[in-house]
Regions:
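Class I S-adenosyl-L-methionine
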Residues: 2-132, 247-248, 272-285
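Beta-strand/loop-alpha-helix module characteristic of Rossmann-like adenine-cofactor folds
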Residues: 8-23, 128-130, 137-285
Length: 285
């Protein structure tokens, strides 16, 4: 068991017996899970899973007391109610002084409300709870598509959140819109939205990009034998694209980086003249 300290007071915490650890088995079956996460699953009293069905079956081979939370989803059911039920199921076992593991697709902290809320609630109730990282979809995307997010910068949004709120894009950076299959969904149900909602999204993106700008639909594989799905097409063709609930939209930069000359001049004034060549190299000059 971890020895944990209060972030505020720096004092050792006295925890109740039950524990909760949320882990991520990664994206690809058996290939991404860390030994640390695997050991947590093997040593748990009970494991709850919310992953691809194939991955859930494999996790059950590591611990026979494994239960899927997927049955809590239902057509026309508010996803927030489903998340509350998932959280309640795990916390009930923690309160029974069990070592509980929640295994969530990819990274348990990325596009997954239940692990964050469950850990917060467990901690507030005096139980030890924490998260172990896993390989997430963005890590796979960078590798599969050869993208370095540090080269031009990278903005990431959940597609519906981008649509519902006044967000600003930087078209000189990569833009990644997650959960494209739910884009524009106001019902908060598990349904797949369609061409009309995606047309609204495209209309918003056309404020920043040309209709012919090339964008990619990306899907990470689940099995080691599968290849990633990467489909390139024009931005204005997105409404009629073949989209699934695991589709992600990747938008490459649509314009060059614009130098901030005023700031560069200020920074150059800080350095001695002998460093001029190095400062020019840093700016790619």
């Amino acid at each position: 068991m971890r020895v944990a300290y209060s972030v505020i007071a720096g004092k050792k915490m006295n925890y109740k017996k039950g524990t909760l650890v949320c882990v991520g088995p990664g994206m690809v079956l058996g290939a991404h899970i860390t030994e640390r996460c695997k050991n947590h699953i093997k040593q748990a009293d009970i494991v709850f899973t919310s992953c691809h069905p194939v991955i859930e079956k494999w996790l059950a081979t590591l611990n026979s007391c494994t239960y899927s939370l997927q049955h809590l989803y239902a057509d026309n059911k508010d996803r927030r109610n489903t998340y509350q039920q998932m959280q309640a199921a795990m916390l009930a076992e923690v309160r029974n002084n069990k070592k509980v593991v929640g295994a969530f697709y990819g990274h348990p902290g990325v596009f997954a409300q239940v692990p964050h809320h469950s850990i917060k609630q467990a901690t507030e109730e005096g139980f030890e709870a924490w998260m172990e990282p896993g390989i997430s979809a963005d890590a796979c995307l960078y590798a599969d598509m050869g993208i370095d997010p540090g080269a031009y910068g990278c903005q990431q949004f959940e597609a519906s959140q981008f649509m519902f709120y006044q967000r600003k894009l930087d078209p000189s950076a990569y833009v990644i819109l997650w959960q494209l299959g739910h884009a524009g969904d106001l019902s908060l149900t598990p349904r797949l939205t369609g061409a009309p909602e995606r047309q609204v999204l495209v209309d918003m993106l056309l404020e920043y990009y040309a209709p012919s700008h090339q964008v990619a639909i990306y899907e990470s594989p689940f099995l080691p034998t599968q290849q990633p799905r990467i489909i390139w097409q024009r931005l204005d063709e997105l409404p009629k694209a073949d989209i699934s609930l695991i589709s992600t939209l990747v938008i490459p930069p649509g314009r060059r980086l614009i130098p901030n000359d005023e700031i560069v001049i200020r920074l150059k004034s800080i350095y001695p003249a002998s460093h001029g060549k190095n400062t020019n190299k840093a700016l790619g000059e």
